[in-house]
């Protein structure tokens, strides 16, 4: 008999450097997700560009046949590498924040600005150790674009976070 709860945490694709056309997740049409549950085993196709949310939906469509239920959450962080306070604006999932001031020792203005657009982005922000922690509870991808184009404004670093909050990939 199979009794108990099992958790599989997949860290997914790391943060990517800025570019005109974002990269899709590195899967091919031939990739399958195999689901081994107490009710049975099933496979579902993984598609290029699937978010964690889309993958969880595919797994959950087979819950009745496998007994496996999936959830998806997405975490990322933004930090400034400059001790000097600078004014930025960013796009989160295509929605522009208001201007905020950020430094390596102060992120509260940025957290407030990001949370002002959270109803549109699905991403909430909090602060931890002078970093902005971004969270999407549905597992949608989180995109961040620095809108400040002046010289000397390249201090923001975006990192992919695992569910444990630890940095697993840095871009910037």
Where are these regions (language model features)?
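Long, low-complexity, repeat-rich, intrinsically disordered, solvent-exposed domains used
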Residues: 1-172
């Amino acid at each position: 008999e199979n009794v108990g709860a099992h958790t599989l945490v997949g860290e997914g694709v790391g943060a990517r450097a800025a570019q005109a056309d974002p990269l899709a997740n590195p899967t091919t049409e031939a990739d399958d997700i195999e689901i081994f549950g107490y009710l049975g085993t099933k496979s579902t196709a993984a598609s290029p560009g699937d978010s964690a949310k889309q993958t969880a939906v595919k797994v959950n469509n087979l819950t009745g046949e496998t007994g496996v239920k999936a959830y998806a959450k997405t975490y990322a962080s933004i930090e400034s590498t400059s001790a000097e306070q600078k004014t930025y604006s960013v796009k989160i999932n295509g929605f522009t924040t208001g201007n905020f001031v950020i430094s390596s020792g102060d992120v509260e203005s940025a957290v407030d600005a990001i949370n002002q657009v959270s109803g549109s982005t699905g991403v909430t922000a909090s602060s931890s150790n002078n970093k902005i922690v971004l969270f999407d509870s549905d597992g949608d991808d989180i995109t961040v674009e620095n809108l400040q184009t002046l010289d000397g404004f390249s201090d923001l670093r975006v990192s992919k976070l695992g569910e444990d909050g630890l940095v697993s990939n840095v871009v910037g």
